Amino acid sequence: HVGDGLYNVAFSGDVHYDDTRLFNGAVNDFPRVETLVMESTYGGRNDYQTDQEDSEEKLKEVIRETTTEGGKVLIPAFAVGRSQEIMLVLEEAMRKGEIPEVPVHLDGMIWEATAIHTTYPEYLRDDLRDRIFHDDENPFLADQFNHIDGGEDERQEIADGGPCIVLSTSGMIEGGPIMSWLTHVGAQSDSSLVFVGYQAQGTLGRRIQNGWDEIPMNDRSNSRGTLTLNMNIETVDGFSGHADRQGLMNFVRTMNPRPEKVLCVHGDESSVQDLSSALYHDFNMRTFAPKNLETFRFK
């Protein structure tokens, strides 16, 4: 609220219009709102995500194929949100016998972030909250989840062992323990690297997605300077914490009340401009695609 509340600005944050395994869909019912500042990560005209059910099936297929061959599945993931979403998929799939019961190793801040989700289940999706509160069934505490706390020695032991799944930060392969896992597992042709999140332009994750197999390690964890990737590279869309183009349009279409102005932010330049233009044409509202440090006066 600005001043006495005569002008009201809503910030979408990272918004997902539909329910996910972890959270209920975004709330877009407000007492008053004049301007909406909305993310545009997948706001491009061709940014449509795969249905989550299809995405889960593809992930399970990659896991089945890789573990059957004796390999390891390495999943770079954001510590908050994405990792817990994937954990729920893995726990259910193993419980139902849809994928082999192999260890799932959690590295980086994933364990700590998951503990926060477990501590505050009242903020989670309704049915997940009920499982934890009323059924005394916490999927995040399943036996297959293992916290990596032994450093490089433990990672090397796992890399030398049998089939497993590794969830590790950072989600865009820009540092963190994922670099160590690439060093240990990257040369294994029977293993798979699976992207389940957005890879921004300029990140190492995006370069690997685009076909790079000679990875500069920059003295992070590999004295050789570069690493040759022999792993299978897979991308599974549909797990993003961001709504796709249709979801963003639906968020505004069903918003109550509908804002007078929309500032499209947090996206590649083309995505921001595409979404801003689409909102203007579809809803006849004032829309903007701000540049960095551009200033707006609300009145």
Regions found by a protein language model. Give the residues of each.
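Generic long, charged, amphipathic alpha-helical segments
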Residues: 217-252
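Core dinuclear metal-dependent hydrolase active-site scaffold
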Residues: 1-24, 154-159, 165, 177-181, ...
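Active-site neighborhood of phospho(di)ester-bond hydrolases with catalytic His/Asp-centered motifs
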Residues: 10-15, 37-41, 76-78, 106-108, ...
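Hard-cation-handling environments
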Residues: 59-204, 219-221, 280-281
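Short, compositionally biased "basic patch" segments
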Residues: 21-41, 122-128, 199-228
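C-terminal structured "cap/appendage" subdomains that terminate the fold
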Residues: 250-280, 285
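Short, conserved loop/helix-junction motifs that constitute active-site signature segments
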Residues: 28-32, 99, 184-189, 253-258
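His/Asp/Glu-rich metal-coordinating catalytic cores
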Residues: 1-85, 89-98, 103
